[in-house]
């Protein structure tokens, strides 16, 4: 199928059909049809003479019913001129599709005799194949489209089960949807459940994320009706995130996944659409855009994997029958950057493969500019061995797939044994124009030259006729042969005088049984290009039809003795016309049928059984993992049982076992050899000593979910500059770079597998595979002398680097400065970037345009390092052109969603300002809150921005030991900031006591300075710890435990179990940590946090701290142990280890039940001072590493590391079971995080469910699990879903009030910033938290609407006014109800009229302020108190044509949840009018302070 977007053009394509040759009987009949535009998408309906093509310019479609002799335009309905693409059904010879423009399409079910139109409310997707076909039911098709509104586009997938008679929406926002049964062979030989025929797989975004690394693979057997689909259990039944796409090949369905922080892919395979297994490639890495699934056999997959990223070469692999284990066939295959591989299986003959390989691969690997020398190789045994192609005694090399010049297969066709190609003899392949046409009629064993020069070629009548056309320039002749290319005749094309064409396509019907061919070519006439479609018919050249004596029994494969060879248990023969027979077969539409003779079984008929892999010598099959003996068979290690030999007969192999090998015969196995070794039941310890006294730093190169292997790699640099590496988490260490002076190690910022080891000279080494191999590189200059990193890394391109080096800094008299260079191949070649820079950085592409080359640099003004002005400049073309954003900056920071710049003022005493960009192109000045009292803004700390908002710490007091500042939070585009929390502590280095909880969005903790007034007078700081569960909108104190770990009460009391200023839990935070990696929480242990601190009024010194734990994300805490401990999480929180901090010890404490109970373990005979405890960053390992020194009696000198291995512990020796369909059926349960101030359990407007291991289950989690299971109910909006708007600040009772003397942002800006906007809303003091998904409920930010200029008509349609009787009832009924309810409330209410307390929640009964009978009437009650003024205002407001609006409930349950921030904005039509004078009605000028509210909300 060829898909091309076509341009509309005037004029008709078909001009003439007048040139026909009237040849005598010794030549073919040739008919020429002239076209004005280039024909494209030409195809035959299989087993017919019906051919179709598409106008390459004006969107017309043509059909020929006589193999191209006569063409007619398809003029059905509105099809003429509307075709976008034309394609046949790949598995149904009667069906084809014309995909049109504007959602109109056509289908034929009778080879273009009739057409039926169908429509879809979407355009065709430019990112995916438009049609996806079912492998066994041609009426089942999916259409992948896209629906756009302005610049907002949503991908939509539709399906039909009746050949497009009806069409249904399958899902929105799904990509790469595929039928489970995608090929005719899928499931053959298996007893698949009936529902698999309906099963569809789709790639969808993550539940909380749009990043590709969070994509999920969902499937449904009900077309995604009534459910959101089930997540496919790709890895041992567990879901895997980061699914890129799916693909099908014969009997297999494949899914490729990529984890965050690696470009290594994992390939998962299934042959039944239920059980998936990870494919193993004999130790070879598979990387993104670095593998190609090739034409596979009926019994194996063949995949070419890129072997070197510096040039296009690969390794060919072949799988076993279930696609799980791959073995190498041949190295250094030739491929191109588009993923095409020089590989072809010879059609109709099993086991013969033609490939091209790179002869000078070593030179090519060293330099990408070295030209490849390509040689051809052929295999006759399914890729086990390869040999050169031979033309006589010379090696022959042929052009293949990477530079194919024709449709379809390159070398072969269904004509048995006939193979052709363009190439040359000699040492390697030359240019195409230097090639000749070669042919083999024995399936590639022997070759001979057929014609000089390059030709296109095609086979007909099962090989009786071969046609060739000159392909190095223009021609007006064709060549043909009736004797397998031994001799050739020529025929002239009946073209106009002096016209010669350049051949574009030469083709025939797919089965090569016809005597008719179609040639497409173009000729230049003056300034125009003319196009011709030429029908060539040999049917009348021979009258005789072949009979038996004209045929031979031809063996498809021969062995080295030139005898018929066996493959898949049989010999293959064809009844083939003899080369010199003077006849035509004339069996059009009848494919050649092979005959088979069975063979006795040999070793080649067997493959490794499931759970076995080939041994290193390839002669036997050894267990890939521990075997399971039959139940009850192994009671003692010395027992024996009968089990698999390790081999099995390849499925589909027809060999005869009698008299042959029976490698699959069960054998006797010893239980001690094959049983899984029982857990020793103990923790294992490995201690290692080093000569250095201490370590300078260490870091992990951690495997990701898609990484192969089982290493846990740690790299350490000691205080003596020695570099050590351990691949087994510190059990064994190896020194590296002993002869080199490594001065710095720079792990790749974005890819876990990569690290760079640098010297002061500019030479260095790097690893791409977590320390398994190291390669050397040379930088253009020594590292810079600005104490800044020499390397800057690209977020998406692993091999793109920027090197900032020092020039003229060797005392030569020049001006020392920094120069930046870039490379796209890890330093193999460097290119100049910028001079006189301080630093340069790549900018992440996502949501910031389409260019990978966006680079930001800080450059000194006028390239003068003495200048005090540092400019921020950017470029998208390596600074061929540049853009200056700011002329005088202090620094800039790149974050996941924003680029934030600190800008200096004109004078030294001026405050800093902030600039923000989300696309790297346009910057806006950040609007900082005026209620942050900062005399001069001198320092900012950029925190994080993973929740669609940026957090900044703005320093208020910068005096040493008295530093603190305000925590401010942005809106979704980073430009408008509001105060989140005052007086947040920071240290002299600029670090703030602020930390977000890992694994759970919106939860963060901060330490505040509680005695600000005293600190301003010089007093020491006193701290309190605060927590937020709605991303900084509301903060509360930490609730203290009821009792300590020894059961004693604390010396202070709470109020109703809630914290007070005098009694709360306070924890030591970021600024007091020796290692900032020691965080409260873990990405794997969702909901758990550990910290050291105390209960009381303030945080006390660390020396008196105890250790506390929470298991519900900070809502409740308990004391884990008395004293201060260092902690680390393992196995995603199923193991927690505590080690005393600052106290010598021989023992550690560990918990297997999330800290509910603790056990002591002695890890050393000598007391040690433990400096740190570590594990892999994801906290998924069962290994821990202690770093310290022996200090007790009998101590050894030097640094010691102690590996603590829990994998042998009996309680952690069995893998936990997670069933995605029934997530709570086995070892896991679903945990819902909650908001402490919301009784309904909602957090960010929804209820999310996370997988957590049941604490009582004795098993281990293993590799990182996908914790987030689902997002359940969407909640109504409450106060917790809003934060204070710009220039508003929170009050003690939780409401938001405008800062006195300041104005809100101009709300009308939405009209100018968004041309599609219809309305704007008056400021209310509230704005939605960007992370919330809430729907309905309190719409605190959208109450009073007004039309945008010149949008009054659209506004009126959106908000129709009440008229007539409707208006009367709108006035009278509310007043009557208000009077009645108001009177009742007046008798029962507590007298606090005129007070709106938006921060309060709870179920306070019938007359609670959130009660539906009170929350609205109370505003009117407030008006009744002043009825003389309020009522006229109410009445008059109803007559205003542009009044404000309040929400009117719709159909309720039919609504869909908001899927994005834009989705909420799009529902502004759900509101109708109320009064403009609402503030006066609500009495908001009379709000009072409330001590009770202060204590309840914990607001500071």
From Swiss-Prot:
Q: Where is the composition biased (Acidic residues)?
A: 1481-1494
Record GO biological process: Golgi to endosome transport; Golgi to vacuole transport; protein targeting to vacuole
Provide the alphabetized UniProt keywords.
Glycoprotein, Golgi apparatus, Membrane, Protein transport, Receptor, Repeat, Signal, Transmembrane, Transmembrane helix, Transport
Glycosylated residues are 298, 322, 810, 973
The BNR repeats lie at 378-387, 438-449, 480-490, 724-734, 821-831, 1108-1118, 1150-1159
Instruction: List, alphabetically, the GO terms of the cellular component aspect.
Output: cytosol; Golgi apparatus; membrane
- Highest rank taxon of the organism: Eukaryota
Locate the transmembrane regions by residue number.
1365-1385, 1413-1433
Task: Report membrane topology.
Answer: Multi-pass membrane protein
Q: Do you know which CDD domains this protein is assigned to?
A: Sialidase_non-viral (cd15482)
Signal sequence, start to end: 1-22
Localization, per the record, is: Golgi apparatus, trans-Golgi network membrane; Prevacuolar compartment membrane
Q: Which Pfam families match?
A: Sortilin-Vps10, Sortilin_C
* Region described as Disordered: spans on this chain: 1481-1500
| Main location per the UniProt record | Golgi
Q: Which segments sit on the Cytoplasmic face? A: 1386-1412
The residues on the Lumenal side of the membrane are: 23-1364, 1434-1500
Q: What does this protein do?
A: Functions as a sorting receptor in the Golgi compartment required for the intracellular sorting and delivery of soluble vacuolar proteins, like carboxypeptidase Y (CPY) and proteinase A. Executes multiple rounds of sorting by cycling between the late Golgi and a prevacuolar endosome-like compartment.
Q: Which family does it belong to?
A: Belongs to the VPS10-related sortilin family.
Name it.
Vacuolar protein sorting/targeting protein 10
**Species in which this protein is naturally found:** Blastomyces gilchristii (strain SLH14081) (Blastomyces dermatitidis)
> What lineage does the source organism belong to?
Eukaryota, Fungi, Dikarya, Ascomycota, Pezizomycotina
Gene assigned in the entry: VPS10
